[in-house]
Amino acid sequence: MPIATPYEDLLRRVLETGTAKSDRTGTGTRSLFGQQIRYDLGCGFPLLTTKKVHFKSVVYELLWFLRGDSNVGWLQQHGVTIWDEWASETGDLGPIYGVQWRSWPTPSGEHIDQISAALELLRTDPDSRRIIVSAWNVGQIPQMALPPCHAFFQFYVADGRLSCQLYQRSADLFLGVPFNIASYALLTHMMAAQAGLSVGEFIWTGGDCHIYDNHVEQVTEQLRREPRPYPKLSLSQRDSIFDYTYEDVVVQDYDPHPAIKAPVAV
């Protein structure tokens, strides 16, 4: 069976047919709008093999989100620096992803734990069409170091299988999206385990899907490479989704091509 390469197919499509656009960082991009890719999580874990993805950073970032944290201190303690460019001198990032996931503020002064609420619906009302978690809190965007790129996601259960669809408003295809795919695939595995479900699909939907002009050489190199089989994910059982540790998450048989470095557009 041929190896599915939806991410690489999108990368090639944007590289070849994308529209030249300016952007906030002043770097310049080529871009397509409204793209979608799908992975069957039962056929392997979608950690890219056409270049090595730093999975340690993926796992720790997701655990950091699930902690409801928004200070880079905890990440730095574990050797992860992917958020440092946007942090204040004290390490703060404002009310970004983790804060919104775990402690969305209400007008009455209360807070909503969206992850716990989503899990409760998966267990008690899996056919609900309201199993959604949003990081896009319009009223708090000015306080965020960076407005959410991956803005909200929805869970869907069919035949005992849990699928997740993410909407990403702004998609740095070369650097950011490989992390996002792996992160939300991992979150889907965790949520499925906690709800007593198998995994279904991870569907990634992108708004502004772009390749930065200073990433074109790296993208071209990546697209020359032959894809390899996806690894398998091994996840320890925990009583709560908030109890997972880095050691609970293991990818097996991951044999990627070497990493490709590229500058981050800040």
UniProtKB/Swiss-Prot annotation:
Entry keyword set? Cytoplasm, Methyltransferase, Nucleotide biosynthesis, Transferase
Read off the CDD domains from this record.
TS_Pyrimidine_HMase
Query: Which coarse location class describes where this protein primarily resides?
Result: cytoplasm
Location of this chain's protein in the cell: Cytoplasm
Q: Does the keyword Metal-binding apply?
A: no
The reactions it catalyses are: dUMP + (6R)-5,10-methylene-5,6,7,8-tetrahydrofolate = 7,8-dihydrofolate + dTMP
Per the record, the similarity remark reads: Belongs to the thymidylate synthase family. Bacterial-type ThyA subfamily.
Its assembly, as annotated, is: Homodimer.
Please state what the protein is called: Thymidylate synthase
